[in-house]
Amino acid sequence: MPKIFEYLGVLIFFYSNEHEPIHVHGKYNGLESKAEFYIVDGEIVEIKIKLVKGRRPLTGSNLKDFEVFLEKYADKIVEKWVDYFNYHKNIEFEKINTRIV
């Protein structure tokens, strides 16, 4: 389970056996949601938050923090996903404790 970011306590990661579409999971205190990235002609055109089967979803401020982070770091998240799954590179974990405004 490569952890790629932590933002204000929300852990952002993917499972090592993942598949397309490109997506990441956000987890906080046992709650978990996932975000799928829809890409057309190399551009991210949409990010959809989805439920994770068997898990209670992120709620309230944690869900909002996850959404804000995804919007700001979408390109970097996709880059890390591609590096890990397509190029089998090690990826760096980054912890961010400053709120995005």
Spans of model-derived segments:
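Acidic, low-complexity intrinsically disordered segments
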Residues: 55-101
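A short, structured beta-strand/loop element
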Residues: 20-60
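Short, charged/polar N-terminal "headpieces" of proteins
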Residues: 1-32
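Broad hydrophobic/π-residue packing in well-ordered secondary structure
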Residues: 10-12, 16, 34-36, 74-83
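Residues in flexible loops and secondary-structure boundaries
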Residues: 9, 15, 20-22, 43-45, ...
